[in-house]
């Protein structure tokens, strides 16, 4: 019935996301290497690394409230499958499509609300491409380096952005990169965005909640990190390298489906 359908959609989303994570990882590593030679640090679970998520669970149709987000992470932790892979972190995250108001133009944008920021961090390497720090207050934002250079926006500048029915001013406190947007193009486009035609930015959770009129802790993504780097199933071989990870994903899908069906 309907819940079966829901479950199937979600599983496809998760598996697709795992593949995305793999490709993002490869391109991120190559990209990082060309930018500043910090290639060896990019995956570190340290201040210099970004710690890409190993599994994403996405809510493609709406928003989970704070209570549901926390409950899902709790259920995932409590019912983790018998596996050599150990759960390190489950972090609810919010990501919304929106707008940046630039001069008289409405520029399509994607905004991320990043709270703990342990998994899939914003990357501000010690390199002249980037500067500043992460957003901490609800009126601060880190903008992507391509937004900074393409629209001539710098540290300390105020920008006006929108999401949902909200429209507010934020102060730029950082310029950096994020693994979701290394290839800087709108979703579905094969071509990189021309300067000034696309924006991405990274706010505190409180900042994005305030902008979009959301409740505290609302999320539409769960980023799951396991200890170490698990083996992924590489799409270009017949061998199933990521068997262990596939079992974990199957189990997570069941947990999420069961939890949502019972709420």
Q: What residues fall within each predicted segment?
A:
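Membrane transport/envelope proteins' first extracytoplasmic loop
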Residues: 1-263
């Amino acid at each position: 019935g309907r819940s079966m359908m829901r479950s199937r959609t979600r599983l496809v989303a998760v598996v697709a996301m795992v593949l995305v994570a793999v490709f993002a990882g490869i391109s991120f590593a190559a990209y990082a290497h060309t930018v500043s030679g910090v290639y060896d640090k990019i995956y570190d679970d340290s201040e210099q690394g970004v710690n890409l998520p190993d599994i994403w669970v996405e809510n493609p149709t709406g928003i989970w409230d704070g209570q549901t987000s926390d409950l899902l992470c709790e259920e995932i932790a409590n019912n983790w499958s018998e596996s050599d892979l150990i759960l390190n972190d489950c972090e609810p995250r919010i990501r919304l499509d929106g707008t940046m108001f630039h001069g008289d133009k409405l520029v399509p944008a994607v905004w991320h609300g990043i709270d703990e920021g342990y998994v899939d961090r914003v990357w501000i390497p010690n390199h002249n491409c980037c500067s500043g720090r992460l957003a901490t207050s609800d009126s601060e934002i880190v903008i992507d380096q391509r937004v900074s250079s393409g629209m001539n926006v710098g540290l300390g500048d105020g920008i006006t952005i929108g999401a949902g029915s909200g429209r507010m001013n934020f102060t730029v406190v950082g310029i950096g990169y994020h693994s979701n947007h290394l290839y800087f193009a709108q979703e579905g486009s094969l071509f990189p965005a021309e300067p000034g035609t696309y924006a991405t930015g990274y706010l505190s959770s409180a900042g994005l909640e305030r902008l979009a009129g959301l409740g505290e802790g609302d999320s539409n993504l769960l980023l799951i990190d396991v200890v170490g780097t698990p083996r992924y199933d590489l799409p270009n071989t017949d061998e199933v390298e990521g068997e262990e990870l596939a079992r974990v994903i199957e189990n997570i899908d069941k947990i999420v489906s069961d939890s949502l069906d019972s709420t």
